[in-house]
Amino acid sequence: VPDSQQKKSIVVLVSGNGSNLQAIIDACAQQKLPANVSAVISNKADAYGLQRAKNANIPAVFLDHSTFTSREDYDRQLLAEISTFSPDLIVLAGFMRILSPDFVAHFEGKMLNIHPSLLPKYKGLHTHQRAIDAGDTEHGVSVHFVTAALDDGPVILQSKVPVFAEQDPEELAQRVQVQERQMYPLVIKWFCQGRLLMKNNKAFLDGNELEVQGYAAD
């Protein structure tokens, strides 16, 4: 089988800068991932992630949520756009919309998200400030399968960073993002190699059910 046919197809959804998208594009280009990014789709016209896609000659699709009357209508159109690329995997990389249950169900077990906290702590926004305000000594990032509840799907991998005294959230965010750019391509690689799957709302790697905090490297 030609190499190109063995590669998995990924569609990445972004709303902003797309630094994780860039890490994924680079990993594919360097043959570190047995995959190709088939398209990048954004709900924001000015998302720099769209420019990153164009720079890499990847189809960049802007789908404006403000022109739809309901979340369900938007998600139906989003589903149609994604389906034209026949992806094996959907990757949320800073996609700042809550997805409707029907959309999530359609891609069950084939959609990943990265969230800047040690889930189940700090679902939602402003995670870095919340970790600092709580006096946490460690913070981090989680990659998880997407389920209908926000930031609630089974965790695949977490990475921790220390929280220093007098820490400001921007600096903490930067250190978390360094971890993100290493972790996300790794988890995507596991998926593309057929090593990672979700069943019964649990994540499995190499046939082994993962712990609540995901794969433990230590």
Label the model's feature ranges:
Residues 1-48, 52:
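N-terminal Rossmann-like dinucleotide-binding module
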Residues 66-79:
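Glycine-rich, highly charged phosphate/nucleotide-binding loops
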Residues 56-57, 107:
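Short, structured coil segments at secondary-structure junctions
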